[in-house]
Amino acid sequence: MRLIIQPDYQSVSQWAAHYVAAKIKAANPTPEKPFVLGCPTGSSPLGMYKALIDLNKKGIVSFQNVVTFNMDEYVGLPKEHPESYYSFMWNNFFSHIDIKKENTNILNGNAPDLDAECARYEEKIKSYGGIDLFMGGIGPDGHIAFNEPGSSLTSRTRQKTLTTDTIIANSRFFDNDINKVPKTALTVGVGTVLSAKEVMIIVNGHNKARALYHAVEGSITQMWTISALQMHEKGIIVCDDAATEELKVGTYRYFKDIEAGHLDPESLIK
């Protein structure tokens, strides 16, 4: 696992965006062999998306031959609802870049058969040869996508009941009214994420410090699903200083030392 420690959220976002752009450019994708990108929602990736939009507008990276698969979607929320993840992606990312609409994939939380929708999603990912780079964020309890504590580390795309903590955390997007927050969601599984060729997770803020500790120094456990990233041969966590507050000093210094030559985002794009 790589741990890229940046001073603040803006630096995290810039590094993550340049890393994604570099991976897309290096793959030299074509319509026949597109680059397949896994996309998260929430507050963590917003800065990265803004930076990617800027790189796209400057002509540094193109998304014309990129196919995306989103991590999750609420069940029962109309896709046009301002807080659906469909709306989130189009408002904050897709509508600002040169991606083709038919190349974007988001789970349908209003499908008549939700189990069939999840199975279809997994099969479509496989049809592209898997995901090249899965981006993500985590919750304060270490959950990836909506894989709450206790989720199987080999799980695939399925319907999940949200924990009270997640509902409370997400209520900030629903007028701070927990009764407006959907109680279930469709989500890729931990196994789905780990099947990607590469995984990059953004962790920022003091409230994620305990989760980062479990991700880097803790044992692998279903109670902190982010800890499963330790098993991935190409896992990267990009974090800010505030998120490292529960790491051992030795761990912090180790990663700062070995990644010292890779912290400048501009150096990532050749």
From Swiss-Prot:
Q: Which GO terms describe its molecular function?
A: glucosamine-6-phosphate deaminase activity; identical protein binding
Return the EC number. Answer: 3.5.99.6
Gene3D superfamilies, per this entry?
3.40.50.1360
Catalysed reactions, as listed in the record = alpha-D-glucosamine 6-phosphate + H2O = beta-D-fructose 6-phosphate + NH4(+)
Pathway-wise, it operates in: Amino-sugar metabolism; N-acetylneuraminate degradation; D-fructose 6-phosphate from N-acetylneuraminate: step 5/5
Q: What class of enzyme is it?
A: hydrolase
Q: Which GO terms describe its cellular component?
A: cytoplasm
The reply to whether Thylakoid figures as a keyword in the UniProt entry is no
Q: Which InterPro entries does the UniProt record give?
A: Glc/Gal-6P_isomerase (IPR006148), Glucosamine6P_isomerase (IPR004547), Glucosamine6P_isomerase_CS (IPR018321), NagB/RpiA_transferase-like (IPR037171)
> Where do the catalytic residues lie?
72, 141, 143, 148
Q: Name one GO biological process term.
A: glucosamine catabolic process
Q: Hydrolase as a keyword?
A: yes
| Keywords carried by this UniProt record | Allosteric enzyme, Carbohydrate metabolism, Hydrolase
Q: How is its activity regulated?
A: Allosterically activated by N-acetylglucosamine 6-phosphate (GlcNAc6P).
Site described as Part of the allosteric site, located at 151, 158, 160-161, 254
Q: Mind telling me which NCBIfam families this protein's record contains?
A: nagB
Q: Which PANTHER family match?
A: GLUCOSAMINE-6-PHOSPHATE ISOMERASE
Per the entry, what this protein does is: Catalyzes the reversible isomerization-deamination of glucosamine 6-phosphate (GlcN6P) to form fructose 6-phosphate (Fru6P) and ammonium ion.
Q: Which family does it belong to?
A: Belongs to the glucosamine/galactosamine-6-phosphate isomerase family. NagB subfamily.
Protein name per Swiss-Prot or TrEMBL: Glucosamine-6-phosphate deaminase
Q: Which organism is it from?
A: Bacteroides thetaiotaomicron (strain ATCC 29148 / DSM 2079 / JCM 5827 / CCUG 10774 / NCTC 10582 / VPI-5482 / E50)
Give the gene that encodes this protein: nagB
